[in-house]
Amino acid sequence: MSLPAAFVPGFVMESPSKTLTDAHFLFFSGLTGDVHPIHYDCEYAKRAGADRPLAHGMLLASMTAFGATAVSQQTHGLVFVDQGSRFIKPCYVGDTIRPRLTVERIWQEGKRKFVRLGTEVINQRDEVVLTGFHVYQLQKSSTNEVHHG
């Protein structure tokens, strides 16, 4: 297991921004089977109190994937073990979002070591639309030592 030296509490990683399109909604719907009309039917969305069809919450959550960060290519031995998300504001087709992950803490439980990353998705108006967390277990290196850096 190896982590970059800068991978300490407070370290921030951002993934490239993406502008959401109808294709994102369609692909996500096809992949997951989530075809709820709130995501594609304008009239249904308006009746439900939204301006227009909403992005799938789990589409937004999936965009916080650690593997999408440049830092992930320098980090080895992390196993994804937990996550949570809160959806703060709606997202729509045409919104440009950028995921941000922040190392919140690194701790040990017995012989196992963990990292908790705070997750956020921010829109083009710099509004946080999603907050959450990921927890990763750090696997031991081949010498059974846990290295940091």
Residue map of PLM features:
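Hydrophobic beta-strand-centered segment that forms part of the acyl-chain substrate-binding groove
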Residues: 46-55, 61-104
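A generic structural signal for short beta-strands and their flanking turns/coil linkers
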Residues: 9-11, 16, 24, 34, ...
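Secondary-structure boundary/capping residues
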Residues: 37, 73-77, 112
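Residues within alpha-helical segments
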Residues: 11, 30, 58, 65, ...
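Catalytic strand-loop segment that frames the active site of acyl-thioester-processing enzymes
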Residues: 1-55, 140
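Short, intrinsically disordered, mixed-charge
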Residues: 30-33, 69-73, 124
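HotDog/MaoC-like acyl-thioester-processing domains
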Residues: 1-9, 91-149
